[in-house]
From Swiss-Prot:
Family statement drawn from the similarity comment of this UniProt entry: Belongs to the cytidylate kinase family. Type 1 subfamily.
Example GO BP: nucleobase-containing small molecule interconversion
NCBIfam families: cmk (TIGR00017)
Highest taxon, organism lineage: Bacteria
Cell compartment(s), UniProt: Cytoplasm
Chain residues that bind ATP: G11, P12, A13, A14, A15, G16, K17, S18, T19
Gene: cmk
Entry-linked CDD domains: CMPK
EC primary class: transferase
Annotated source species: Anoxybacillus flavithermus (strain DSM 21510 / WK1)
Enzyme Commission code: 2.7.4.25
Organismal lineage: Bacteria, Bacillati, Bacillota, Bacilli, Bacillales
Record's catalysed reaction(s): CMP + ATP = CDP + ADP; dCMP + ATP = dCDP + ADP
Protein name, as recorded: Cytidylate kinase
Length: 225
């Protein structure tokens, strides 16, 4: 494939966005950009400083003081905040339970979107998040919206936590995911919603390979078209 395009992958929490996006980027030799990790890095730094996640002004002070880097590695994307490797630290329950509150602040989103657009401006990227196709990369050649039931998403997150050695409660995860869906969908700025020209894929009963294969076919069509 000669032409380098932009691929936007959106969807609710634990719908498989990151796993699918990583596999696509690898298959296409594209750059993978996990925008959720950027919000998680900010959330982690704010919590470390004891900043109130509901205070936009304080969060913006933290954000302006924080240089977030996403670096590829053989084991997957590494996340750095001011030179500190926070890849594992941003996946704790504390960060997970607060990131939606951080991401709903208009000024925070505006600054993050600016940084994300700079990362994706030259194409050859697979970017995943909540508002990539609608807000960050509205002109992306391929837009995918991944869905899965709350039950299935909680199951996936539970298995992921167990693998990472993070304490995990399946029923609690179901409640937290449903709550995050509500916060993400109802926020005033760039809420979670499918772009009009996005292709919806329900991943509930599909394997990662099946989802990746479907998207690869769509990408092939756009590149050749």
């Amino acid at each position: 494939m000669e032409k380098k395009i932009s691929i936007a992958i959106d969807g609710p929490a634990a719908a498989g966005k990151s796993t699918v996006a990583k596999r696509l980027a690898e298959a296409l030799s594209y750059v993978y950009i996990d925008t959720g990790a950027m919000y998680r890095a900010l959330t982690y730094c704010a919590l470390q400083r004891g900043v109130d996640v509901h205070n936009e002004k304080q969060l913006m002070n933290v954000l302006h003081d924080t240089y977030i880097e996403l670096k590829p590695s053989p084991s997957g994307q590494l996340v750095f905040a001011n030179g500190e490797n926070v890849t594992e630290a941003i996946r704790t329950n504390d960060v997970t339970n607060n990131v939606s509150y951080v991401a709903k602040h208009p000024a925070v989103r505006e600054e993050m979107v600016k940084r994300q657009r700079e990362l994706g401006q030259h194409g050859g990227v697979v970017m995943d998040g909540r508002d990539i196709g609608t807000h960050v990369l509205p002109h992306a050649e391929v837009k995918i919206f991944l869905l899965a039931s709350v039950e299935e998403r909680a199951k996936r997150r539970h298995e992921e936590n167990v693998l990472r050695g993070i304490p995990s409660d399946f029923e609690q995860l179901k409640e937290e995911i449903a709550r995050r869906d509500q916060i993400d969908s109802e926020r005033a700025v760039a809420p979670l919603k499918k772009a009009e020209d996005a292709i919806e894929i329900d991943t509930t009963s599909l394997s990662i390979d099946e989802v990746v294969d479907r998207i690869m076919c769509i990408v092939q069509e756009r590149v050749e078209g």
